[in-house]
């Protein structure tokens, strides 16, 4: 082969080597540039996940417990009568289940000599409105619970006018006139009260209800079976108070089969699990036990 051809082939070989090297280098650059973009996307996803998770901490059920129990009346209802024009009547506030002796309308609340943590589930209730309605010759509900700062709404659904009277201990008294068919009236209750406050009607004296005002949501009213429940209490020592309109503070009771003295209705408990069963509290007459 002539030398000119050998030289020409050598030049072509060198050119192809250079082109291959450039192509390989370009591929290497493209390949190495992609991982940083993928890494950025991965970091962004992780950051977004972290922000979403930490935006509002989840409530741990391990920090809150629910307390429930039952109150029964084993005394004689016939001994609880009240004089009324035209004769006598049984105490309308003393409602006892005929079969299981459950005592209705026992007010149970957390006594608060110090601040207590409130579960976020109660945030919505704090801005709600509590209502007492005159209907069918009654004030309903018989016991209404209200948080300090909430609004109280008074409604007259009866055929005649009413003049509700609420003589608070810590708040200004209320005595509005509500003619039949009048629009409801609304008031804001600002301060907690020590005990349930009676709501009466100066026109119809036997119309009665009670209003319990506290600066926390941990209040309950026993149902027709005498059962009460306080949900989402913070862990720790608490003091409950028990009160009924026919007896005042429940003091001389039988608690789970044993005589017990509850000073001013106080019951000490430790909330240390998700469910605390107080058991059964029996009341006979609220007189000192032998």
Residue ranges and their predicted role:
Residues 30-32:
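Sec/Tat signal peptide C-region and signal peptidase I cleavage site
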Residues 34-290:
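Extracytoplasmic copper-binding redox domains, predominantly the cupredoxin/blue-copper superfamily
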Residues 13-28:
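Bacterial N-terminal signal peptides
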